[in-house]
Amino acid sequence: MKSKHLFSLASVAMFVVVIAFGVRIYRVGDSARKEKAHWKKLDRILSEANFEGSYLLAKDGKILISSGRGDLSYDNKKVSDEKSRSTDPENDPNKIGRESTVAINSLTKQFTGVAIYQLANEGKLSLDATIGTYLSDCPYGDRITLKQLLEMKSGLPDYALEQALRDKYGDAIYSGMDPASLRADVMALTLKETPGEKFEYTNTNYFLLGLIIEKVSGESYENYITAHLLKPIGMRHTGFDWNLAAVRPFDPSKQGDGREFSHVFTFSAGEMTSTVLDLYQWQKYLYGGGFPGIVPQELFTDGGYHMGLNEKDGVFRHAGATHLYRSNMLYDTKTGDQVILLGRSPESDLNELTTELKEWIDELETAH
């Protein structure tokens, strides 16, 4: 009788273990299915946005995925398609990947902003000083401070949108013009608003900051940024001039490679090129306190725009757009999450796509 009772207990125990094991298998399988579906959703999001370029998503400071979509060149694609080449992105050197260099447009502005803060911390300039302190030949130099330039409150118009300036240079906007001539034209602009009163995004502000960096440091803008910002982080694939970028701009009007603004024209407001991997390191370094005294989350006290960045609720982001390139970057200081998009999709809304991808990262936790 006793042995019979023990046998019954053993049977029940085994049954419970089997059931529990079965439930565990079901849960693991269900979790795997959810996760697989979530990754399929990512591909769908990118496809529906018609995104072409490189992208990187990071959660808790760690890269989830870094890859690319599309061909490096549309002109090369036409030739290659005629030869029926393989389109395997893992083996095709003509496909955009995570190490492909792309024009980053106005993401350049945060590098300019950090450089200004570096020079201020070294006592070489003051954010409260006027432009004229450093650029003595600037007609409006005694009315605008460096801080107002950083915060887009100078009251100046956007030189890049001035029709008279575009008419003057014509094709040289793409092929390149004399830097001294462009500098003189930017200096000749007249105020639209009273400095300090109104926020208005304008490339002129960061163009002028680039000139101040050159004047104060005694180096060219490009040399200063390379030596003091890029090299300390190891950003070996970041540079200047879109002509040297691997990803060629796409011109929808001719369904082929197009031309982008000259790096002389965009200068310190938007001339840089980079990769998603380099920018991932940049954001980790910047928000992690790599530059002493220049931690964005400590400098931004009430949100808004400053030093080439927008901030709201601890999330920093900025967009970039030139003639044919588009870019967008996000960093969440609360989680270390990152979204980096470097594309040549002039008809895509990368602001909306960045928001969608951040939501996808947030939802990843529930997909496990």
Model-derived features: where do they sit?
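Short, surface-exposed loop or secondary-structure junction motifs
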Residues: 144-323, 327-328
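Residue-level detector of secondary-structure transition/capping positions
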Residues: 120, 138-139, 154-157, 232-233, ...
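Active-site-proximal loop and beta-strand segments within enzyme catalytic domains
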Residues: 71-200
